[in-house]
Amino acid sequence: MKKGFSLPLWVAGAARSALKKLVGLSFENYELIKIPYEKKEIKIEIHSVGLLKNDSHALGITFAKSGLDLDITQNLEIWTIASLEKISFENSLQRVPINIIAGSGVGIKEDTSEICISNFAKEVLYENLLDIIPEGFNLKLEIIFPNGAFLAERTSNQSFGIVDGLSIIGTSAETYSSASPDQLEEAKNNLAKLIQNDFKGEVVFVIGENGLNLLKTHNVNLPIIKIGNWIGPLLVDAAIKKVKTVILFGYHGKLIKLAGGIFHTHNHLADGRIEILVYLAVQENVPFEIIVKLSKLDNIENALLFLEKFNQSTADKLFKRLSNTIEKRSFAYVNRYVKTDMEIASIIFDRKRKIRWAGIYGKKYISYFQ
């Protein structure tokens, strides 16, 4: 399996190189990036660095190597522009002397216009920049992805209220393919560690970075494991390990595949999401002319918007059926391989990161997420 590093490390590498240039330190074609709370450094290659605007700004450039051929950030060009601002009375109370700005191609939250960056990414930047900032100054750091706006069109960012570019939401240093068998083994090992000691029987399987970030804002007091696309085999592994309840938590665009019996959910292997929704609409007795229109839409997000515009009650009934079907099909899938009474609950959030729907079992646990 190819090994690579997440986007925050490459951003930090370019930023550290730019800041060092700005304060007169010599250029090297790599930066050793420290990982928060870990005793290791990772070597990040730097493409180039230079001074701008009468030497008042410095530009650092690198190209991300995620190690994943299908990853949207593989070979992503990253620019960081560093400049220093003398601390004045007005900003003397700023807790962290780093102002991170979303430049061209970097995603922002549509409702607040704030840069979309994970806490892990911020911590990596702080860990690797604070020791270089001269005393009495704040660092202004602008992050630019020259190709970010174009690449963002191939993601579901806009569904989550993220516009104008790619978000910086990595939550760990290393990357691995979510379709790789090695990823499955790592997830199994993580599950084994989670259910040791005082394990109460319930575990949350969260699908994707957006789901993980949302969970962190709700302070869910349950063991949590972020899983990739090997959802089915991990459910079976949980049953073998005598887990009592697995709570599937994710965005409807990913979880809907389980309702259609697709338990390895990488889009390059199988999709069928609109077809599954059409089948569920037939089961829910949605008017035929609406079903025909649904079948012609290009993604689940547009389908939900269309249904809500047609009739909010119908949309909610259909997505509740989706939640119940996810639970039923998942239970049937697991019992093909191991006889178990393990409970499988589904809880689904929408494009606005609002937790909206839950299956029969999911309703028992939804209060944990609110």
Swiss-Prot record:
Gene3D superfamilies, A to Z: CbiD-like
InterPro entries documented for this protein: CbiD, CbiD_sf
Functional pathway: Cofactor biosynthesis; adenosylcobalamin biosynthesis; cob(II)yrinate a,c-diamide from sirohydrochlorin (anaerobic route): step 6/10
Keywords carried by this UniProt record: Cobalamin biosynthesis, Methyltransferase, S-adenosyl-L-methionine, Transferase
One GO biological process term: methylation
Matching SUPFAM superfamilies: CbiD-like
Residues passing through the membrane, by range: none
Annotated GO MF terms: cobalt-precorrin-5B C1-methyltransferase activity
EC number annotated for this UniProt entry: 2.1.1.195
Pfam families: CbiD
Catalytically driven reaction(s): Co-precorrin-5B + S-adenosyl-L-methionine = Co-precorrin-6A + S-adenosyl-L-homocysteine
Enzyme superclass (EC): transferase
Family membership noted in the UniProt record: Belongs to the CbiD family.
Protein name per Swiss-Prot or TrEMBL: Cobalt-precorrin-5B C(1)-methyltransferase
Organism for this UniProt entry: Prochlorococcus marinus (strain MIT 9215)
Lineage: Bacteria, Bacillati, Cyanobacteriota, Cyanophyceae, Synechococcales
Gene giving rise to this polypeptide: cbiD
